[in-house]
């Protein structure tokens, strides 16, 4: 796995950064850069991560984020960095 971009969107509450960071740490996914912003009651975060030390397959990580999204009432998505950049190129 290469670098990936994780996006997190949800209603603002205490502990979102902790909850997402905990998942990453437990799976040996390193945060390279992080940006977060509040828009009214909505929390948004974009995280650039290095997944090279993660022992899970890309699909297993995607499935984990889908499961955790439901538990945490957040929209957590992960994309390959190159795909993310191509989709957001002007």
Curated annotation (Swiss-Prot):
It holds the Pfam family ACT_6. It comes from the Bacteria. HAMAP family: UPF0237 (MF_01054). CDD domains: ACT_1ZPV (cd04872). It comes from Neisseria meningitidis serogroup A / serotype 4A (strain DSM 15465 / Z2491). InterPro entries: ACT-like_dom_sf (IPR045865), ACT_dom (IPR002912), UPF0237/GcvR_regulator (IPR050990), UPF0237_ACT (IPR022986). Transmembrane segments: none annotated. This is UPF0237 protein NMA1909. PANTHER family: UPF0237 PROTEIN MJ1558 (PTHR34875:SF6). Belongs to the UPF0237 family. Residues 5-83 form the ACT domain.
């Amino acid at each position: 796995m290469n670098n990936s971009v994780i996006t997190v969107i949800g209603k603002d509450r205490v502990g979102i950064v902790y909850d997402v960071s905990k998942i990453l740490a437990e799976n040996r996914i390193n945060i390279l850069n992080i940006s977060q912003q509040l828009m009214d009651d909505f929390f948004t975060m974009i995280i650039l991560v290095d997944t090279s030390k993660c022992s899970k397959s890309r699909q297993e990580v995607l499935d984990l984020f889908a499961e955790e999204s439901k538990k945490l009432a957040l929209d957590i998505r992960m994309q390959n960095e190159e795909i993310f950049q191509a989709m957001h190129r002007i």
